[in-house]
């Protein structure tokens, strides 16, 4: 039951011609102070129609509004404020959560629709750095949120597995590589070779030509070049899979850039058919001057295609294969122009489905105010950060609860969860200041704080067993009421997170629920034997359901003991 909908329904019986129930619902606000009620309806938009001041309209509406659902209705200036019957609402909300369990919050507006989400997309033979964390975790969370809203979700890891860098890497491996050494630590060793190539090229310009020659061989299907490329790709994907497992991230497919090699000429043919290609200094481009953008480069003067061609080809392939209604590209803000050009070219081709495509950018991870990329002159590996976080979580557990069962498993859940939650707790366009020490604290706005609150609630339920099926729940105190109101908001929070492509909406929400529950825990004697005990335990159970599901939508696990 949504009490705002109930309020909107009651108001729509008064405003039969002036406003629809949906318009009323959109206008309803939640007062910042409890003394102004549980919901408020502003009357400003009706002043012109009624030819009366909003305050007079509010007074007249308050007099007409009667519903057993409300214990009090009052006009305060231009607002109609209502106080809900706490017994009725708490009983309805708790019964809904107890019945639906982890299904609670499910929306259906995405039913029979498909969304493709392109996220993570690391480059083969390069380390999985902290820079990849944001795209990976934002995309993973958006995938869970879209599924919760009824969408069929296709999660694509558009691996960077093609390009001239592979000619350079093959050259470096042929000159300085050792198969046994590479097999021991593939990504680190291949990256070392790639870096060595760029060091050596300063004194040996012929290396550039050798790199080009090997890439040409690769494009032409040379057996040795293809065999090495396949090996580099296979070893890299094995490494990436280990990190994805640690983060709990899954994809529908790993169709990378190379997958589209044989499809690009067909797409270039479509551009030619629509007379969109122009020659510019020997290259082929789509002119976007009318749209106020530089031309979109399709084929370089040496005949090579670039990533715009690949992305355009991939978009058409994905539409033909999955018939998507929405396509999200979770990629850094530096690619904004590329996506504007890419979407505009598709529009010029007359594809209406481009309206469902969206670039979902995000801020940077900073260390001491600077973009985080190197530590002692090298790339900061995400795996190292996760291992460090898990180790610190283990130390925290040893200090706080040395007898905890499954310490290793819980340390993984807390360590990885801390890194993920820290990434998702702020609006995605905000830059993030990285601090392992802060993100692992058990108090404040952290993942471990929410996880610990969930574990605390679970520990209360282990002490008592209640059959909730036959109960009627009555909760009147302010601490309980604040939680009930928050729990009731969960479905609309999920919908807002989905519509805004914004996981932080859920992060902030679970923090609010955790803080509200901890106030309740500190002020209410939950296990006291009296008439409200079953209702209080039902509330605790409902909190565990919503916290666990909220964390799951973020890609964070919720241990039952910590």
From Swiss-Prot:
Q: Where in the cell is it found?
A: Cytoplasm
Which Pfam family, any one, appears in the UniProt record?
Arg_tRNA_synt_N
Is Mitochondrion one of the keywords UniProt gives this record? no
Per the UniProt entry, the Enzyme Commission number(s) are 6.1.1.19
Query: Which coarse location class describes where this protein primarily resides?
Result: cytoplasm
- Spell out the GO cellular component terms annotated for this protein, sorted alphabetically and separated by semicolons: cytoplasm
Cysteine pairs forming cystine bridges in this chain are: none
Q: Which reaction does it catalyse?
A: tRNA(Arg) + L-arginine + ATP = L-arginyl-tRNA(Arg) + AMP + diphosphate
**Motif annotated as 'HIGH' region, chain positions:** 122-132
SUPFAM superfamilies xrefs: Anticodon-binding domain of a subclass of class I aminoacyl-tRNA synthetases (SSF47323), Arginyl-tRNA synthetase (ArgRS), N-terminal 'additional' domain (SSF55190), Nucleotidylyl transferase (SSF52374)
One annotated GO molecular function is:
arginine-tRNA ligase activity
Mind listing the UniProt keywords for this protein, alphabetically?
Aminoacyl-tRNA synthetase, ATP-binding, Cytoplasm, Ligase, Nucleotide-binding, Protein biosynthesis
Specify whether ATP-binding is a keyword of the entry: yes
- Which biological process, per GO, is one annotated for this protein? arginyl-tRNA aminoacylation
Question: What is stated as this protein's family in its record?
Answer: Belongs to the class-I aminoacyl-tRNA synthetase family.
Describe its partners and assembly state: Monomer.
What is the official name of this protein in its record?
A: Arginine--tRNA ligase 1
């Amino acid at each position: 039951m949504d009490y705002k909908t109930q309020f909107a329904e009651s108001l729509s019986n008064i405003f039969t011609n002036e406003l629809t129930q949906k318009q009323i619902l959109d206008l309803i606000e939640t007062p910042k102070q409890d003394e102004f009620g549980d919901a408020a309806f502003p009357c400003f938009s009706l002043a012109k129609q009624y030819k009366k001041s909003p305050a007079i309209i509010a007074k007249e509406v308050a007099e007409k509004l009667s519903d057993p659902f409300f214990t009090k209705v009052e006009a305060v200036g231009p607002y109609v404020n209502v106080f809900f019957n706490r017994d009725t609402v708490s009983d309805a909300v708790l019964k809904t959560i107890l019945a639906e369990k982890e299904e609670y919050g499910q929306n259906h507006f995405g039913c029979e629709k498909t969304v493709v989400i392109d996220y993570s997309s690391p480059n083969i033979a390069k380390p999985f750095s902290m820079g990849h964390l944001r795209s990976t975790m934002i995309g993973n969370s958006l995938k869970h949120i879209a599924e919760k809203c009824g969408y069929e979700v296709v999660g694509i890891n558009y691996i960077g597995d093609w390009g001239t860098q592979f000619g350079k890497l093959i050259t470096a491996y042929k000159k300085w590589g050792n198969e046994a050494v590479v097999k021991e630590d593939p990504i680190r060793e291949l990256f070392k070779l790639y870096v060595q190539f760029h060091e050596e090229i300063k004194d040996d310009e012929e290396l550039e030509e050798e790199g080009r020659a090997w890439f040409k061989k690769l494009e032409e299907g040379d057996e040795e070049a293809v065999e090495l490329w396949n090996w580099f790709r296979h070893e890299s994907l094995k490494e990436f899979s280990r990190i994805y497992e640690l983060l709990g991230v899954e994809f529908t497919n790993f169709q990378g850039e190379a997958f589209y090699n044989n499809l690009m000429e067909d797409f270039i043919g479509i551009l030619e058919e629509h007379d969109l290609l122009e020659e510019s200094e020997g290259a082929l481009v789509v002119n976007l001057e009318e749209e106020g953008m530089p031309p979109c480069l399709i084929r370089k003067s040496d005949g090579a295609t670039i990533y715009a061609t690949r992305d355009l080809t991939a978009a058409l392939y994905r539409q033909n294969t999955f018939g998507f209604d929405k396509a999200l590209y979770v990629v850094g803000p530096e690619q904004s122009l590329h996506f504007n050009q890419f979407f505009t070219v598709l529009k010029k081709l007359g594809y209406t489905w481009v309206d469902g495509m969206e670039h979902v950018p995000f801020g940077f991870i900073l260390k001491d105010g600077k973009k985080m990329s190197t530590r002692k002159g090298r790339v900061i590996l995400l795996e190292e950060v996760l291992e460090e976080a898990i180790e610190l979580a283990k130390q925290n557990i040893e200090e706080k609860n040395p007898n905890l069962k499954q310490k290793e498993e819980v340390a993984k859940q807390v360590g990885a969860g801390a890194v993920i939650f820290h990434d998702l707790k702020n609006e995605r366009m905000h830059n993030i200041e990285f601090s392992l020490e802060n993100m692992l604290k058990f108090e404040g706005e952290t993942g471990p704080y929410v996880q610990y609150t969930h574990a605390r609630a679970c520990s209360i339920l282990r002490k008592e067993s209640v059959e909730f099926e036959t109960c009627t729940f009555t909760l009147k105190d302010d601490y309980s009421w604040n939680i009930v109101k928050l729990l009731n908001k969960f479905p609309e929070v999920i919908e807002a997170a989905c519509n805004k492509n914004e996981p932080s909406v859920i992060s902030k929400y679970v923090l609010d629920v955790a803080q509200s529950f901890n106030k309740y825990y500190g002020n209410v004697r939950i296990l006291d034997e009296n008439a409200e005990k079953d209702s209080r335990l039902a509330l605790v159970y409902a909190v565990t359901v919503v916290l666990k599901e909220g964390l799951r939508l973020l890609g964070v696990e919720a241990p039952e003991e910590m």
